[in-house]
Amino acid sequence: MAKVIIEIKNTVSGIKGRNLRTSIAVDGSAELDGDEGTLAGMVALLVLNKSQKIINESAHEAIEILKNDGVITSGRVTEMAVEKTCH
């Protein structure tokens, strides 16, 4: 089983009217506005997006190592997408 740990730094939250405002930096930054449920969903999508990038990079590196060691002669990683809907 693989374990991916994602560290979200510089997280700031505040209340703006009935909505929450959250600023998150994950190799970049995103400004999010919305209620708790909406923000939770958007944060989850950011984490999934970052996880997908880590997995793709790791898979590319693993294929290159196997090629260099002569274990395999070719290989590739196809891109996968996370479909999301924001209300």
Curated annotation (Swiss-Prot):
Induction notes from the record: Expressed in the early phase of the viral replicative cycle. Expression of early genes is repressed by viral Repc (latency) and favored by viral Ner protein.
Keyword line: Early protein, Host cytoplasm
Record's subcellular location: Host cytoplasm
Protein origin, superkingdom: Viruses
GO cellular component, one term: host cell cytoplasm
Name of the protein in question: Uncharacterized protein gp7
Source organism of the structure: Escherichia phage Mu (Bacteriophage Mu)
